[in-house]
């Protein structure tokens, strides 16, 4: 499609004409550009005309008579009288459809869609002016055939004569030159275009001050960008939208337009190419700015302000690497915020706190001096006068893409003593808190993992092979202790820290000893981060949530004995299943999980005690292999426990497991005696898996009066739960029921308790009793029956036992 475009200008406006033409030709081929003028030298046309021809386009010099009717007509100060030349378009341009463009605009994309718009017998199509009523005459898609037929030139001149007289006599307010005349003559004869075809940015600052939200809310790509009003990119620094783009087209070489159409060149914003820093200021005083600017010539410094700027700031424009943005508007500031690499919080006086918070949310690196820091927003803070330190930091960031050296004044110092190179979430914390120093100390040399972290994060400081004196010095100077080292315990050092009355923060999985630590899940390190930020701002830390209360083994047994209670035990396996997982002896089952969720939510009472693992308050009375298990378990599931469990107390799940996982095993014998006293001289009904054979080969149930057994599937017994309940009811009369059947035991115990039976869920009791009797220090596999959590019942050689066989009253097997 051949596209006919008309521009108008004079010899004082050739720079602007040239910029507009460059933008047209950059985005379009096959255009015919008429330039209405009276005094532009023919020499000026040669270069753009040559380039246009290579793109299948033309540039035509249209000279208007020197003495023209509009020479002395009224106009606004920033507008040339040549603007009235568009009255004469129909006289000089023969094409039927013409696009008129002012020369204070740039084209931002192809004009194909604009030229394809049907004018529907209207004289022109245009975009509304900022008043929302009239049209702006800077972009006019003209029905030139109709202009000729209806002698529009004559009508415009006649109306101009009448209106000019009213203006001269002071009877016409808000006169806007030929735009006013066009609207008077064509007030009902124009088609409205979308804003994209004439995005008027000259009123941006006015829109901001007057809260014209819609004016600044345009987010689509504009086709034409119009620099209306006197706030032009070449006359003012006012930071309206797309000001920088006008200068990019202004500086564009004609040859680069050809290269663009050959696929060899793209106009890329300097913001996307240069390394830059941003400062938004409310004052003229920027700490160390000239030293920064002169020392870092390859770094661009963007200085923005909501208001106009004073001479002190404007003088900085003499530096090639300074960009001033006075009277900036939010869209321009947002663009700078996204594009710049660093923010320099170096302005004295007040600051836009919401803007600074938005930078923090975007994880932008902020640098500040002590005297200019605004709030506690994770700034890297340098001592006053240490501009050279900030210079080195900017160089470091520019070279590496992140900070590798640490010259700032720390806002908080945290110490960790370690006996391994594994420090939980250290990289996350160091990255999120660049102004916090993380000191890592050890008695020995350190591994490569820690050195790698210290190279990546300049705020990690390593102290390998530390002396006692140096460690004591670090202890005294630290603000908080982070008990976050893994593997080898450092509980003795943490105990020392507890005497200093300084905060000790730990993850459940990294906790070393019970030393008053504030505990967090390592799966939510942002919670520890939030508390460290409170320590930076010296805010009070919130009181930790109350610990879930679980009675000890003896206290639980005493309660059961006193009240003849039933017992439902939830261990780690049941919690895994409640969280949506299958476990070795029970496939995941929605119905089972729903029932267990209801049971664990019950309040313990005299007839039913709900039990949880007694590992909420002390995970360090277990063996060396059990401690990390329970630390990891609580790290992963503590939130889940709090969601499920709201009762004021629970019994201990360990009532049937009082031996193998405890470091101190001396109490287990007495606890088993308490257990055995419950069924002494009582008739028992044991409900167990086919491989359990509880009491076979030991005296666990010797004091019972009699025993009956119901044998069930060892795996996924819940699939037969209704049959099991029916069989149990047949034989349960007058008997104490012992259930050893994994998650299914929870359902049976609860349901049978509701029917009035006393039921004890005592899974794993037989293995624990065997281990206690043999004095085992670790789990020993039994060859003739099930071993708790060992080998999943493989390689068992069952021994025929007449007593055991005689006790079986029912078998319900898969």
Swiss-Prot record:
Alphabetical list of InterPro entries matching this protein: Glyco_trans_8 (IPR002495), Glycosyltrans_8_dom-fam (IPR050748), GT-D (IPR014869), Nucleotide-diphossugar_trans (IPR029044)
Biological pathway: Protein modification; protein glycosylation
Protein residues bound to Mn(2+): 102, 104, 226
GO BP terms, alphabetized: protein glycosylation
Cross-referenced SUPFAM superfamilies: Nucleotide-diphospho-sugar transferases
Region GT-D domain, annotated ranges: 542-814
Binding site for UDP: 8-13, 102-103, 226-232
Function: Involved in the polymorphic O-glycosylation of the serine-rich repeat protein PsrP. Catalyzes the third step in glycosylation PsrP in this bacteria. Transfers glucose from UDP-glucose to the terminal glucose moiety of already-glycosylated PsrP (using truncated substrates with PsrP SSR1-GlcNAc-Glc); the C-terminal GT-D domain is sufficient for this reaction in vitro. Also transfers galactose from UDP-galactose to the terminal glucose moiety of already-glycosylated PsrP; the C-terminal GT-D domain is also sufficient for this reaction in vitro.
Identification of the protein by name: Glycosyltransferase GlyD
UniProt organism field: Streptococcus pneumoniae serotype 4 (strain ATCC BAA-334 / TIGR4)
